[in-house]
Amino acid sequence: MIYVHWLFLVVYSIIIIITMVRVLMDNRQPAKTMAWMLVLMFIPFLGIILYIFFGQNTRKERKIWQQSLDQLTKRSMLEFVEQKDFNIPEEYRTISNLFMNQNLALPFKNNEVEIYTSGYDFFPSLLMEIGKAEHHIHIDTFIISDDPLGRIIADALIDKAKQGVEVRLIYDDVGSWRTPNSFFMRMRNEGIEVYAFMPVRFPAFTSRVNYRNHRKICVIDGEVGFIGGMNIARRYVQGTPKQSWRDTHVKLTGAAVYGLQRAFLVDWYFVSKVFITERSYYPEIIIGQNNSLVQVVTSSPTSLWPEIEQGYVRILTNAKHYVYMETPYFLPTDPILFAMRVAALSGVDVRLMIPYETDTKVVEWASRSYVIEASKAGVKILLYRKGFNHSKLLVSDDAMATIGSTNVDFRSFENDFEANAFFYDKKIALQVKEIFLADQKDSIDLDDVRRFIKKPFLQRLWESFVRLLSPLL
């Protein structure tokens, strides 16, 4: 028995060493590498299991993803080139070029933009546009629930499929894990093409569970699109039994829908291995009344660059007057936290709004030390108290804004597939600013919250320990 015991320890030690070498060779951010090292060293056995399920890299998918991205960019690139008299204003040129150089995200002019700040406004508009569809409906969502709202959306899609409209739905297999398969089978049986994104089935489970499609995109007839923070579930309208829900979503009409279409079709190729590039999915541009300049930007763990994260850093470092941000989860990467500190210490009015109470306690504990650190540099921290604020937005200098699915955390910037719309338009920026200032009225300043400022030693120690694991949360 003694020999068996020692043999087991030797084998386990070899596995740990091999795994740690693999973590090092991945060449990730030092914080993430160190977090996995700590897990492997100080959580025996369970640490190995956690790494197998959540720690493996996505390099294998990168090549196929890049090929699909290149192919599906060609159509929207043609439309981009055809834009007449198109000249990006100087103040937006550097960030627009950043996104174009990273993954060929293209800016488009002549867009009409409508912003929704609650599910009560967004979902009736979505259903209305679904009802108008004549050619196709494309939906990409993290969560679609088998609840009253989910069934209403499903019924609307089934009705359009029966009318001959092409309906395609992508849902995230982890985000929608509570939704029974019968819900999706009913749609499939009625002619809707439905795919789960990266299904978590053995043996693929271990390599895929950590990389999720967090995007919330809808494209209708290639003319109207939606993007933002709301999934398809009742709580995005009514909230939860504990608290109400605050969120932000956007309706786009105009050429920027090409960007949404490209994002969906890249995901569609990934799940179905079917290329869709026909002209009918990129119809003639409908000129929006607002004439807004919009750039739809995606990011993913398969990308060479963290596109949206680098965009946020660029905005923070370029800001001259203010940057206002809303996020439900604040576990910033080093570049984001550094940029926030530098901006605030340079005299820029940097404000960060997070929920007073999150829906995940571990994330709340981990975020507190980041919040205090940002606050010490002069970032004004606001805690939203009128329910749970799930909104993901940023506005800067009355000049530009972004709304989408991206949280200010490691998961969104590094592990998840995300999508944001960037608006280079003073009118839209002022709208987003007004939304932020309205939310600020329902918030309290961090300095007024005793539990954040004066904490016992053991609590501070615990929060600092959990912070070490923030790259994994």
Where are these regions (language model features)?
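Short, solvent-exposed amphipathic alpha-helical segments in soluble enzyme
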Residues: 185, 339-343, 369
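A short glycine-/small-residue-rich loop at the edge of a beta-strand within enzyme catalytic domains
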Residues: 303, 307, 327, 331, ...
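A beta-strand-loop signature enriched in Asp, Gly, Thr, and Trp
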Residues: 346, 351-396
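N-terminal localization/anchoring segments of enzymes in phospholipid and broader phosphate metabolism
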Residues: 1-310, 314, 318, 358, ...
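Helical hairpin unit composed of two closely spaced alpha helices linked by a short loop
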Residues: 319, 329-351, 355-356, 360
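Thr-Gly-centered strand-to-loop micro-motif
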Residues: 325-327, 384, 403-404
